[in-house]
Amino acid sequence: MSSNGSLTKDEVVNIIKDWNFSWSIIFLLITIVLQYGYPSRSMMVYVFKMFILWLLWPASMALSIFSAIYPISLASQIISGILAAICAVMWLAYFVQSIRLFMRTGSWWSFNPESNCLLNVPIGGTTVVRPLVEDSTSVTAVVNDGHLKMAGMHFGRCDYDRLPMEITVAKPSVLIALKMVKRQSYGTNSGVAIFHRYKAGNYRRPTIIQDEELALLRA
């Protein structure tokens, strides 16, 4: 450092080198999460993505509060205070909606920050729950060699002949029921079925068996 307190050229270059390595790792992780962070691709990466999204609210609020307490100017203090209030209100709204959805479904997927829709499919005496990113009046089920996929997501093993006749989509304010309207087999224990919305109401979905749900998430 020079006598007047400013950094020398070599010190600036060394700092850039250090941060360049760190940011290269950070951006690589962000790229992986954005590229593969979908339930239809990798459930493990998707859960990691949800964890990062969940941490962004308190991190944003903490930074805004810190900027409001230690401002660089009066304008930045006012703006930081407004941003902190907005973060707090939105985070509270997220928890309210998530708790309402949890009371309706009993699934920890209710706290998914990316979606407030849950697809509930009864299979083999339990109900498998997956987050539904896109809301739709119809859902397509594909069974390939005894393995079920719905809305692009894996639901584990399920025989084509044992497909449920009704599935549900849960939201914080409503539970939507979809019934099978068409099915077509195309091989041994394989086929396609279409479920279409036919009723909605303010009622709860039957509780799930948590251990089996977690086991399916790890599958």
Swiss-Prot record:
Q: Which UniProt keywords apply?
A: Glycoprotein, Host Golgi apparatus, Host membrane, Host-virus interaction, Membrane, Transmembrane, Transmembrane helix, Viral envelope protein, Viral immunoevasion, Viral matrix protein, Virion
Please tell me where this protein is predominantly located: virion
Ribonucleoprotein found in the keyword field? no
Please indicate the ranges of residues that lie on the Virion surface side: 1-18, 71-78
Q: Is Glycoprotein a UniProt keyword of this protein?
A: yes
Question: What is a single molecular function from GO for this protein?
Answer: structural constituent of virion
**Cellular localisation:** Virion membrane; Host Golgi apparatus membrane
Q: Where are the transmembrane segments?
A: 19-39, 50-70, 79-99
- Kindly give the CDD domains that the UniProt entry links to this protein: MERS-like-CoV_M
The record places the following residue ranges in the Intravirion compartment, namely: 40-49, 100-219
An example Gene Ontology CC term for this record:
viral envelope
Subunit field text = Homomultimer. Interacts with envelope E protein in the budding compartment of the host cell, which is located between endoplasmic reticulum and the Golgi complex. Forms a complex with HE and S proteins. Interacts with nucleocapsid N protein. This interaction probably participates in RNA packaging into the virus.
What the record says about family reads: Belongs to the betacoronaviruses M protein family.
Protein name, per record? Membrane protein
